[in-house]
Amino acid sequence: ATKFIQMLTPRDLSKLSVGQCKYVLIVNNDGGILNDPVLLRLKENHYWLSLADSDILLWAQGVAINSGLNVKIIEPDVSPLQLQGPNSGKIMEALFGESINDLKYYWLRELDLDGIPLIVSRTGWSSELGYELYLRDGSMGDKLWEKIMAAGKPHGLKPGHTSSIRRIEGGMLSYHADADINTNPYELNLGRLVNLDTDINFIGKDALQKINQDGIKRKQVGVILDCDPLTGPNTTFWEILKDNEVVGKITSAVYSPRLKQNIALAMVSINNSE
């Protein structure tokens, strides 16, 4: 399983310990990004990929068939739930006790909450303190929800959804918006997740070596939009023009109440990236 997982990602996993998580990229043979999941190592030969907004099951199964490795690939019956925000630590302490405060960033722990089996990781799709709870028994979903909401009530916990504001402020990607199969890691300033100077073998290594050597033609940047406050996130790409020529596109944009301005992620030609 370890050898197979390493085939999927250009990030060196040789020092990934049991109980540890890593943010990784999965790329195709051309170096294009297929997904940017969080990898969780539950046991010596047991891994989870907590995926972004694209499927990777058929890709992984196809790679496995042609790898000759003895691996089993399934979609686990788990229901991920995120608890994010400045008070998430206090709520987790109310649920699990003070020991939860020892859980390090990007590590996981197998826990039982009054008979509810969970994998808890200190990860999340926000730039705040946060946790992800993976429910391992779907029949206990209602019970888990009620317990979390009860513990969170004194701290103002409310149901929510993915926060475009917080993730754009933190420069976090949204697959299909900020990245897709035609985007490579270097265009997203994610070269740190590509370890070319190692002996590891992974899909797309030759292509990424060439891209790294030749350089990129476009690059993701953060921008401020000087206009009236946006009423919501963009739902289409917005062209960026310079001298009436298209030099890029806005991929994610939103108004930030904290920063009191419109902020965005954009993909622009390398000559216009400064």
Protein language model annotation of sequence segments:
Residues 2-33, 88-116:
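Internal amphipathic helical hairpin motif
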Residues 40-274:
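Conserved, structured C-terminal
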